[in-house]
Structure formats: C-alpha cells, structure tokens
Amino acid sequence: MLPHKHTKEGVLNEKLALKKLLTYMKSVYKIPQKIKGLSDERKRKPIPLFNIVMPVLIFLMLQYESFHTIFSAPESMEKRPKNCIRGKIPKVDAVRDLLSRIDPKEIEEIHAQTIDVLKRNRVFREGTIGGYVAAGIDGVKLFSSTKKSCPDCLSRKNGTRKTEYFHRSVVCMTVGKSPHVIFGQEMLKPRDGSEKDEGELTGAKRLIRHLKKRHGHFADVIMADALYLNAPFINTLKECGLETVIRLKDERRLLFQDAES
C-alpha cells in the first residue's frame, strides 16, 4: 500500500511509489498493454477504454472506497492521482457502463497470465509459511440486495422473510508472507426450481481443479475452515497433489479423536 501523504515528504514518496508501481506493471506484467487489448462493445466511445479501466484498477489497488470519490468533478480533483487519468475525466455513469460491458473472461485471462509471470519469476521460491506455499480458500459474499437482481444471482429468505439476492464466490489466495496473491475465484451458480443454489464446497472443488489445470502446482498446502472437512473436497486436493490444513472449532474436538483413532 502506498504511504499516506501528510507531509511534503509523504507526497513525494507517494508519487515515487505510484510511478514505480506503474512502471513495474508495464515492464514486468504488461498489464497496461493487455488492458488496451480488451474488447470494447460500446457504440459511442468518447473516452478510450484504457482511460477508464486503468484508473479503476489503480484506485482499487489504492483501496479507494467509492468511484464517486474519484470520478466526480471538480471537488475530487485533489484526490485523484494525476498519473492515472489523462484527458477528459469520465463520469461515474460512463465508468459503470463500460465495466458492465467488459467480458469477465478477458479479465480472468489477464489475471491468469499475471499468475504465470509470478511463477516464472519464482516469486514464491522461499514459500509463504515455513518454506511452503500456503493458500487459503473460503467463500466470500460480493453483493446483496432485496430489490435488484440478475440471472446469475443466488437467493434466500432473510430474517424478515424477504427474498435476498446476492452473489457469492470461492476465493483462493496465498497466506503468510507478502505479496498476498489471489490465485483464482469461482462464482457460485444458481439452480432452477426447488433445488438449492450451488454450495461453497462444489465451487471450491471446481476452483481447485481449474487452478491445477491452468497453473500446474500452484501451491503446496491449502488451508480452510471446518466446512471443508469433507471427503470429496479432500480427495480433490489429493488428486491435485495438494496437502491440507483444516481449522476446527473447539466444540468439534471429537473429530480430532476420531482422526487419531
């Protein structure tokens, strides 16, 4: 994360760190070049795709909480790193419109290629914990609403018996030493009729198999919570040549006794 700019020295350090980050993204991972190659399905293109997507990526990395903070002129001008936006400032509606039209598969491929570079450059040659590359896997809720929904939304009844629509995914990322890298994400899928929506374990197995197929031996150990103490999931890890560490709560200590016996 870039240093806070409370002093002139802090401002200078922040600018240097941002410049170094952008240079590294361009020279090593070729991310700006790949962004320029994304498909642009807009009929009208008053602002180039790159001039929207690249700033969005940078602001996500800088952990800005709201696009309104960035893409609202003129009051946010001082909050916007000048290195990231050149030319006409896109309005937040233009940002939303473009992002909604980008093919997620193209973004996923850029991410996968970034992981390939990390492996090729042996970023994790010393491991992340005790000499091993350890990765955690868990479910993450991404979006929730009782009013808005899409065909890919999962659904359930909340405490007031209203239907809640949400997106949920399973994420696998390194734990331990920096850098903390997300290897991949698998969206859980809705099911028709009376069947329950796809569960976290199903998505996790699919994610592990996909990562193994795409990246080979991407980690040594997978760490998970008690939900993943499941024979089909553990067998999937074994098939992919992965060890596992699963954390159980104290009230489930009988499972330890069963395992020891």
Q: Which functions belong to the PLM regions below?
A:
Residues M1-K26, P32:
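Charged, often Cys/His-bearing segments associated with DNA-binding zinc-finger transcription factors
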Residues L22-M54:
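Basic, short loop/linker segments at the boundary and entry of helix-turn-helix/winged-helix-like folds
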Residues K45-I115, N230, L237:
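Short, positively charged, Gly/Tyr-enriched micro-motifs
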Residues V53, H167-V170, T202-R209:
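Short, contiguous clusters of charged residues that form electrostatic/catalytic patches at enzyme active sites
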Residues P55, I70, K91, V95, ...:
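Short, conserved catalytic/metal-binding motifs centered on acidic residues
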Residues R96-S178:
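Active-site-proximal, Lys/Arg-enriched surface segment
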Residues I129-Y132, H167, H180, R214-A219, ...:
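A general structural motif
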Residues M187-S261:
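An internal, acidic/charged active-site-proximal segment
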